[in-house]
Design a protein with these regions (language model features):
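N-terminal helix-turn-helix DNA-binding core of bacterial DNA-binding proteins
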Residues: 2, 6-53, 80
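Non-catalytic interaction surface on structured domains
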Residues: 14, 43-45, 69, 105-115
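A cross-family signal for key residues in well-ordered alpha-helices
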Residues: 17, 26-29, 68, 92, ...
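Beta-hairpin "wing" of winged helix-turn-helix
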Residues: 62-82
Length: 120
């Protein structure tokens, strides 16, 4: 198994790329706020994600064993999403990233403005 993050075939690189996409961490964090959520509730909680992207993100998280999709045999059908133990083991790391972002956001925003102002 390749464990060199610079190698495009490295599984660690692939996992980090999937988690580092635009929506995965936000969806995981949102699902962590409650025991389970229906698709529509999740979509309302993350209003700027499209229906298609939420579907793709949930499928990817399910493939990676981070989200469980439960279909209830009812009419109309009811589907709920919840985090797995693997996702819960990731939460402290997500929370640490959020804390780091809060701690550094003002200086990062300041630096972005400086950089944007210096571009020609």
């Amino acid at each position: 198994m390749i464990l060199d993050a610079y190698d495009p075939q490295c599984p660690i690189r692939n996992i980090l790329a999937r988690l580092g996409d635009k929506w995965s961490l936000l969806v995981i964090y949102t699902l962590s706020q409650t025991e389970r959520m229906r698709f529509g509730d999740l979509r309302r909680a993350v209003p700027d994600i499209s229906q298609k992207m939420l579907t793709v993100t949930l499928r990817t998280l399910e493939e990676d064993g981070l989200v469980t999709r439960t279909v209830y045999p009812e009419i109309p059908p009811r589907v709920e999403y919840s985090l797995t133990a693997r996702a819960f083991s990731l939460l402290p790391h997500i929370q640490a990233l959020v804390a780091w972002a809060k701690e550094n956001m003002e200086s990062i925003i300041r630096d972005r403005k400086k950089t944007a102002g210096s571009k020609h």
